[in-house]
């Protein structure tokens, strides 16, 4: 099957979708946010660098057990998994102490059946390590460190990036059209800019986390990707795909070498499933909207 036909089949199935939340559009008042809680959960890939920071001299820097357990956590789970689990707790996004309490006491059996799976089992397999490391981070003053050294950098990146509300509205209108007229909830378009990640990922509460690198115009030009592309992509993840579409994706996987090759590549990075469809839909929406770039959006500054 030719790639063009594959894309056509995927996009032909766009209409059997429903928006996860449907309370209307709005003005996107709280688009960018920061979160000490999510940054704390995303710290494990950066544990060595953190321990070398002068702020943690004599605490994390001298705790080999912390580093050993942080490395173990990083080898088993990703920041997106930890942040997704915490997003289900209803806990504060700004209080690291609540993160410590949640991971010390959460019961996997209390989670909704629809979110259980191998990813929860992976988190549970390093539960003791998580509890120890999160407690040590809190005791070492991670909340103060984040307020003094991380948050100012994130706020600076946010303040320098400008988005025209009409541009966001146009994106939501296109996604609403694909969803059969059922709009996304604009209040769900909340993005947490985190200092400890270099990518972006959606959360189960319909928000998503994003690296500040994507707010930087130089990075956007160098890698030909910017925040608005990620915004379209992650908002498409908020849609529920129909069983008909999922069956079609499986049929493509079973019968099409092109699709199977790229799906296997996505699965190797912990993605897969509906990811190929979301990428196809992202390109479709982007083409309908025309070029979306940092320079274009800056023209809308007031």
At which residue positions do the language-model features occur?
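Conserved small/polar residues in nucleotide/adenosyl-binding loops
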Residues: 295-302
């Amino acid at each position: 099957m030719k790639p063009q036909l594959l894309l056509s089949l995927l996009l032909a199935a766009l209409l059997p979708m429903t928006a996860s939340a449907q309370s209307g559009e709005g003005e996107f008042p709280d688009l960018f946010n920061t979160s000490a809680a999510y940054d704390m959960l995303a710290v494990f890939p950066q544990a060595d660098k953190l321990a070398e920071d002068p702020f943690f001299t004599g605490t994390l820097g001298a705790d080999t057990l912390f580093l050993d357990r942080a490395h173990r956590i990083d080898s088993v789970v990703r920041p997106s998994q930890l942040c997704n689990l915490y997003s289900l707790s209803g806990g504060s996004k700004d209080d690291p102490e609540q993160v410590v309490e949640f991971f010390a006491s959460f019961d996997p059996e209390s989670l909704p059946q629809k979110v259980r799976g191998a990813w929860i089992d992976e988190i549970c397999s390093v539960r003791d390590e998580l509890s120890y490391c999160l407690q040590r981070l809190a005791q070492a003053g991670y909340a103060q460190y984040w307020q003094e050294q991380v948050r100012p950098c994130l706020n600076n990146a946010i303040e320098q990036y400008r988005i025209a509300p009409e541009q966001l509205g146009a994106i939501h209108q296109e996604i609403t059209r694909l969803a059969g007229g059922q709009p996304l909830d604009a209040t769900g378009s909340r993005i947490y800019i985190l200092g400890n990640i270099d990518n972006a990922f959606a959360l189960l509460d319909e928000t998503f986390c994003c690296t500040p690198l994507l707010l930087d115009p130089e990075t956007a030009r160098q890698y030909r990707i910017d925040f608005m592309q990620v915004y379209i992509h992650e908002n498409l993840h908020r849609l529920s795909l129909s069983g008909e579409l999922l069956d079609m994706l499986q049929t493509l996987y079973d019968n099409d070498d092109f699709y199977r090759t790229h799906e296997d590549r996505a699965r190797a990075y912990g993605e897969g499933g509906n990811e190929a469809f979301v990428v196809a839909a992202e390109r479709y929406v982007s083409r309908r909207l025309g070029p979306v770039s940092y320079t274009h959006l800056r023209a809308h500054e007031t």
